[in-house]
Amino acid sequence: VSYLQKDSALEATYKDYADMAFVVFHRSGGEGHDNPRTMKWNGKSVTDRDSAGEANQPVPGARSMDDHYLQLDQNETDLLAYVCEKFAKVTVILSSSSQMEVGFLDDPKHYAYHDNIVGGMWITGTGHEGAASVIVGETSPSGRTVDTWARDYKLDPVWMNFGNNLVEGSYQKKGNLYANYATDDGYMSSYRGTYVIYKEGIYLGYRYYETRGYTEGLD
């Protein structure tokens, strides 16, 4: 269910700044706050406990239970479509310490794509302090991303090892739980008690994509 609300009084002011619109999408995350890899909801929190029949609905505002936190949800998709309908030029600003899936910027097949999207800015944590200077032309950024951005995180090799493992699968075993205060059966006292496995070593991000063909062949 989308929570997009239209305001006719606000819409009447659009003509005063019709040259371009900016849409800001925010994500939080960091050490001790891994981004959820599922939008399964038990009515109170994100969960993987399907066996108990708890995760039987998507997070409020999500498109699907199979989506993840770094995708645009239904609210954001509807908002972006609405703004693109009202403005001929739209720039998306990403206020996030984590890279989001941004295929909607240039992929016509993406569910959130629109022809009126003309650009995107990634301002990360403190970038908001200089974003206005970039927008008005006082500062000229490099125009390049600082890493390789995946179009589909579920196809990224680190997907199976990263985060709090709130996705069902063969990897969701006892070995993925760090038992520093385990119960008698070897599990943590909390099902969220997981840890990140960096099996890729230093070959994260662009290092993986730039070296995979050399170390493993083109296939």
Predicted features and spans:
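C-terminal non-catalytic regions of proteins with extracellular/luminal or membrane-system context
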Residues: 1-219
